[in-house]
UniProtKB/Swiss-Prot annotation:
Species, as recorded: Rickettsia africae (strain ESF-5)
Keyword terms: Isomerase, Pyridoxal phosphate
Highest taxon above the source species: Bacteria
Catalytic activity from the UniProt record: L-alanine = D-alanine
Residues annotated as catalytic: K34, Y249
Gene3D superfamilies per record: Alanine racemase, Lyase, Ornithine Decarboxylase, Chain A, domain 1
Listed name of the protein: Alanine racemase
A GO term for molecular function: alanine racemase activity
Gene: alr
Residues with N6-(pyridoxal phosphate)lysine modification: K34
Keyword Isomerase: yes
GO CC annotations, alphabetized: cytosol
Length: 355
């Protein structure tokens, strides 16, 4: 097991959830816990949020749904965003998982198994209003409007859609999607609706409908919510190098002075991108320390020359992610997003849950 530790503060995640619930007022707030809770632990996060009365959990696949159902029991709703396929339909039924149906083929499959089991099967419908990934097209929606028998045997619980650019509050595309969604919903007046992802919650009450589906904001990937994640790594090696010494593969860093270089036990095998080579920073006792040389599979080097000698020793912990270096801040260094930083947190890291 890695010497590095990811600490996840469940109290912070719960507080983020309560903030979002407060903004949504009377609308329900679920939680996106796909990709193992954005790399932080879907089971642990879901159990914590159940304590705050969260009852809707969104996963990507049936496999994720089964794992969550086994951990949580039957008293919650687990929604499978990728929908249903012939190979996993029986599994969804067995584990009481609700598929989000994204096209007419998935509706057909779910109807087939409704007939096979001779009972109503619950589902959500996903209407594509402009993100153009998953979701029923305008032509498919029109078919549903004109032929309600296409939904026979299905217990339609929610109609959902997904915003493409909700992080940009003033972008007119948000309103375009909202208006398309409302136009479709008028043909399904008795069905509950869900549109707001994390960013959508902050667009205002018009976007909240009956259920909001935050993911990123729960995990601190929003300016108004707090980061619950800390990643720390101990110094495992120290060396004194003279002027003009080369560091790491391909000698991409050369010392410009006599230097003290420390080595930390993480690398790209742990999801710490090679793009951080010779850029980025870690923190030791709140002080910024630069990464020097190439990020290798299991190791990175940092220049600790400017730290007080009393703070440089084997076992001293460096903070890679935390209050000084949030996932969003780290992501900006290499041109990605905080989501990727979190979901790339390696399986070798020890996970520690507090709060």
């Amino acid at each position: 097991m890695s010497l590095c530790t990811v600490e996840i503060n469940l109290s912070t995640i719960k507080n983020n959830y309560l903030l979002l619930q407060d903004i949504c007022k009377t609308s329900l707030v679920g939680a996106a816990v796909k990709a193992n809770g954005y790399g932080l632990g879907a089971v642990q996060i879901s159990k914590a949020l159940i304590e705050e009365n969260c009852r809707h959990f969104f996963v990507a696949s049936s496999e994720e749904g089964v794992n969550l159902r086994n951990a949580l029991g039957l008293d919650v709703n687990i929604l499978v965003l990728n929908g249903v396929f012939e190979h996993d339909a029986l599994e969804l039924i067995e584990y009481n998982l609700t598929p989000v149906l994204n096209n007419l083929k998935q509706i057909e499959i779910w109807q087939k198994f409704s007939n096979l089991k001779n009972r109503l099967l619950s589902c959500y419908l996903h209407f594509n209003t402009g993100i153009n990934r998953l979701g029923l097209s305008s032509d498919e929606i029109e078919q549903l409007i004109n032929d309600r028998d296409l939904l026979k045997g299905l217990d339609l619980q929610y109609i959902i859609s997904h915003l493409a650019i909700s992080e940009e509050i003033d972008n007119p595309y948000n309103l375009e999607q909202l208006n398309r969604f409302k136009a479709y919903l008028q043909y399904f007046p008795n069905v509950k609706a869900s549109l707001a992802n994390s960013g959508g919650i902050f667009l205002g009450q018009d976007y909240h409908f009956d259920l909001a589906r935050p993911g990123a904001a729960l995990y601190g990937l929003n300016p108004l919510t707090k980061n619950p994640v800390t990643l720390k790594a101990p110094i495992i090696h120290l060396q004194n190098l003279t002027l003009d010494s080369h560091i790491g593969y391909n000698m991409t860093f050369t010392t410009k002075r006599d230097s003290v270089i420390a080595t930390l036990p993480l690398g790209y095998a742990d999801g710490f991108s090679r793009n951080f080579s010779n850029q980025g920073e870690v923190f030791i006792n709140s002080r910024s320390v630069p990464i020097v040389g190439r990020v290798s599979m299991d190791l990175i080097n940092i220049d600790v020359t400017d730290l007080p000698p009393s703070e440089i020793f084997l076992g001293q912990e460096a903070e890679i992610i935390g209050n000084y270096c949030t996932p969003d801040k780290i992501a900006s260094i290499i041109g990605t997003i905080g989501y990727e930083v979190l979901t790339n947190l390696g399986s070798r890291y020890k996970r520690k849950y507090i709060g």
